[in-house]
């Protein structure tokens, strides 16, 4: 991303306020984290408080994704431009929200951006025996997957996106994606760490998926994006 042409107009990161406070503390203390931000901005263009850092090209915001009005207000304060093509990425986020809460977030995103792509990485196939064992193990650690109902299958993942106002949706499990990687790259990855339980790894990858949905962007070819 040193090439200016590859940089997004602005990058937004959202996490719980308590997590953002810790991240901001690390950014302040570690030059390795602060230097890339300062290289792109003069110090007088940076705004920071306990739960937010905002600048011309980067913002990190402390917010609860279940509280849409608060989220929207904070994004507006950081000058999010909903007219620009926007990529939204969630990694094991929606599964910790109730289906109603995640649907509200997805509908808000679909309604807010003129041209957008939403990428979601989380669990899938959670109705089978392996999935149930995963759920039980997490519950024993007091980690409840409030939105696991929508993680039954690839179809339920796609339907969740389409019913929330996205125009197209696709989903693939991670084992399928892994099988499509170039063999040389797979060998390189597997040489980094010895895996003596390939069957377990395959089962795990069959229970995580990548889903993506698009809205608008026909001139950008968003609907044609595949793997």
Language-model segments: which ranges?
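Alpha-helical subdomain
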Residues: 1-227
